[in-house]
From Swiss-Prot:
<dbReference type="GO" id="GO:0005739">
    <property type="term" value="C:mitochondrion"/>
</dbReference>
<dbReference type="GO" id="GO:0002521">
    <property type="term" value="P:leukocyte differentiation"/>
</dbReference>
<feature type="domain" description="CHCH">
    <location>
        <begin position="27"/>
        <end position="65"/>
    </location>
</feature>
<keyword id="KW-1015">Disulfide bond</keyword>
<feature type="modified residue" description="Phosphoserine">
    <location>
        <position position="37"/>
    </location>
</feature>
<dbReference type="GO" id="GO:0033617">
    <property type="term" value="P:mitochondrial cytochrome c oxidase assembly"/>
</dbReference>
<comment type="similarity">
    <text>Belongs to the PET191 family.</text>
</comment>
<feature type="disulfide bond">
    <location>
        <begin position="41"/>
        <end position="47"/>
    </location>
</feature>
<dbReference type="GO" id="GO:0048536">
    <property type="term" value="P:spleen development"/>
</dbReference>
<dbReference type="GO" id="GO:0035264">
    <property type="term" value="P:multicellular organism growth"/>
</dbReference>
<feature type="disulfide bond">
    <location>
        <begin position="30"/>
        <end position="57"/>
    </location>
</feature>
<dbReference type="Pfam" id="PF10203">
    <property type="entry name" value="Pet191_N"/>
</dbReference>
<feature type="short sequence motif" description="Cx10C motif">
    <location>
        <begin position="30"/>
        <end position="41"/>
    </location>
</feature>
<keyword id="KW-0597">Phosphoprotein</keyword>
<comment type="function">
    <text>Involved in an early step of the mitochondrial complex IV assembly process.</text>
</comment>
<feature type="short sequence motif" description="Cx9C motif">
    <location>
        <begin position="47"/>
        <end position="57"/>
    </location>
</feature>
<protein>
    <recommendedName>
        <fullName>Cytochrome c oxidase assembly factor 5</fullName>
    </recommendedName>
</protein>
Length: 74
């Protein structure tokens, strides 16, 4: 779920997806209850949809076709 804040400055490409991925990992049971690091929880498969969205956004920055279509993500 995207979280938009009007008073936040623009962070660059894929910043919204990156921020939401970080929040998802920090609020997951893996981090809160099991005490693991967000990196370990990401490798275990938590927040898969946001991880995939972040990957697609980063990949679209390298894709030559995206210059005309725009970046994927928000």
């Amino acid at each position: 779920m995207p979280r938009y804040y009007e008073d936040k400055p623009e962070g660059g490409a894929c910043a919204g997806v990156k921020e939401d991925l970080g929040l998802c990992l920090l609020q997951s049971d893996c981090v809160l209850k099991e005490g693991k690091s967000p990196r370990q929880c990401l490798k275990e498969g938590n927040c898969k949809a946001l991880k995939y969205s972040f990957f697609e956004c980063k990949r679209s920055m390298l894709d030559a076709r995206s210059r005309f279509r725009g970046r994927k993500g928000y």
